[in-house]
Structures are given as C-alpha cells and as structure tokens.
C-alpha cells in the first residue's frame, strides 16, 4: 500500500497536546511525515488540521488562516496562565456584573485591537519558549501585537460570585482567546480567565468535519475508507477549498512541470492553487508579480 497523503481534520481531545495528536496519527498512517497547522493548548478541544505526506506542504498556507472558537470566560478570578490550569493570583467578587455591563465591556474588543499575548505561551523570547521561561521563574513581558476580532458574540451569562460567560469569536491568526478573557476581566475590574475553549474552525475547515481520534484508531485497525483507513482530503480537494484557484492550460501545466516560469493569471494572491486540466494540484503559486513564482510543486509522477 502506498503511503497516505492529504489533509486530515481532527477533533483534538482535552488533555492532549497537538504533538500528541501528531504522534498518534503518525502511527496510524505509518509515516513520520505528519504535521499540524496551528497549536491548540492541552486544555482546548476542537479543530486541528493535519497534513500527511505531501499534505504537509500545504500547512504553510493554512497556519495564517482566521479561526473560530467557542469558549467560556470566568469573571472574578485571574490566573497566572490566563486559563483554568494556572494558579489563581487574584479573586474579586463579580456578583454585581450584569449582562449589559459585560456586553458594554466587550464592545472595544471587536475589530482591530492591540493584544499582549499570554505569557505562558509558545512564543519564543530570545530563542526560548515563553512558557519555559515562566516555569523557570522568569518575569516574561511579551510585546503587544495587532490582531482582529471580527466576531464576538455572547451566548450566555451565568451569574454568581464568579460569572461564567459563554462566547463565540472569529479571530485572526495569532489571537490568544486566553488573553481576551484576561483583558475582559481587567476591563471589568474583577479579573478573568478561560475555563473552556473549543476551536470550531480553521479557515474553511470546520468542527463538523473533524474526526474523533479514537474512532480513527478503530477505523484504521479495520482498514476503513481512505489510505490506511484514514479519511483524508486529497491534495486537490484541500487545495481547492483552502486557496484561490487557477486552472492551468495544458501548455502552462507542461511548463510548470518542467520547472519553467509562467505568467501570472487570475487571483493576484501570494498563494494560489494551480490545477492541471485534469484536476491535479500541480503547484501553489505566488501571483503578486507579472511572472508567477512557484512556492510548492506537487509533481504528477510522484502521485
């Protein structure tokens, strides 16, 4: 059986690191060529996009996609990690907060904002992960970054000494929902942290198509659909969904196949999926200049 290749959408279980999921899928697929398009915290669940075989070449173009999350923010306590896994560093009664007050405090978080990432994060500071520095007792101060919160909806508010707020957000890549919880709590004067986080979307890939890991393991053992029992999106299917598309002529496809340049045509984007006349994903092109630049090639003879 040939090695599998394509894109797999997994529903990451709570308690698993993203690398744990990659390691499991490597065993199921029988290949080490497995990677993911964006880390999820161990506490979080939801969409994790994996590339297998040559599908790993597509991950570069998925990392920067917008993402959607469902989350629960707890107002009335702040933690060192900005989520429920960290030690509580302050607690203030939030019993006085009304839904109207919470909604008003949320308004400034919509749109383009400046956000300081959570200190306990995978961001590198002088070559070392921020979370490793925090765990070593260092005081880590990360620089603010520009992010966009294109949707911030409140679904439910559950009052008490602490107030739990169920939300749904759509955010740009690099946005920390934990930091949103922290900053909302600060804005309301009571502190806040995240107690639940579920990623519902990465770009065009949604939770409705995500596969349960245990079900994947059972399916793989039974030799179910897909290579090695894994229900993969083909390179062509993933490319058509995730990127702007250019349909090549036979002459253009032949030229690209021989490593020759072609003129840009169609979407003037940095990543355009270029397809042969018979529907094969041949390359990802940068078409921001008159002559298209090849970023990734998927030779037909290797299929």
Set out the residue ranges of the language-model regions:
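Accessory RNA 3′-end/elbow-binding domains used by RNA modification enzymes
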Residues: 1-13, 19-36, 40, 44, ...
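Catalytic cores of RNA-modifying enzymes
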Residues: 1-173, 177-209
């Amino acid at each position: 059986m040939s090695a599998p290749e394509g894109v797999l959408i997994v529903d990451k279980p709570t308690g698993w690191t993203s690398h744990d999921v990659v390691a499991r899928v490597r065993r199921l697929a029988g290949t080490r060529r497995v990677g993911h398009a964006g880390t999820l915290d161990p506490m979080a669940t939801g969409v994790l996009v994996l590339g297998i075989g040559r599908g790993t070449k597509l991950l570069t173009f998925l990392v920067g996609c917008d993402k959607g999350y469902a989350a629960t923010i707890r107002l009335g306590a702040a933690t060192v990690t900005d989520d429920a896994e960290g030690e509580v560093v302050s607690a203030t009664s939030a019993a006085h907060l009304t839904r109207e007050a919470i909604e008003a405090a949320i308004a400034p978080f919509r749109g383009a904002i400046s956000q300081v990432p959570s200190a306990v994060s995978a961001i590198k500071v002088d070559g070392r992960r921020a979370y490793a520095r925090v765990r070593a007792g260092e005081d880590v101060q990360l620089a603010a970054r520009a992010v966009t919160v294109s949707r911030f909806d409140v679904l439910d508010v559950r009052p008490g000494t602490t107030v739990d707020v169920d939300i749904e957000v759509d955010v740009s890549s690099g946005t920390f929902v934990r930091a949103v919880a922290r900053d909302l709590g600060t804005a309301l004067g009571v502190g806040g942290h995240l107690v639940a986080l579920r990623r519902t979307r990465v770009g065009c890939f949604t939770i409705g198509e995500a596969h349960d890991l245990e079900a994947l393991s059972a399916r793989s053992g039974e030799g179910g659909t897909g290579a090695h029992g894994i229900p993969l999106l083909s390179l062509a299917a993933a490319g058509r969904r995730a990127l702007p598309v250019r349909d090549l002529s036979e002459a253009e496809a032949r030229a690209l196949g021989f490593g020759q340049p072609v003129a840009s045509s169609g979407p003037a984007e940095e990543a355009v999926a270029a397809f042969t006349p018979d529907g094969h994903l041949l390359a990802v092109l940068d078409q921001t200049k008159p002559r298209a630049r090849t970023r990734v090639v998927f030779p037909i003879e290797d299929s």
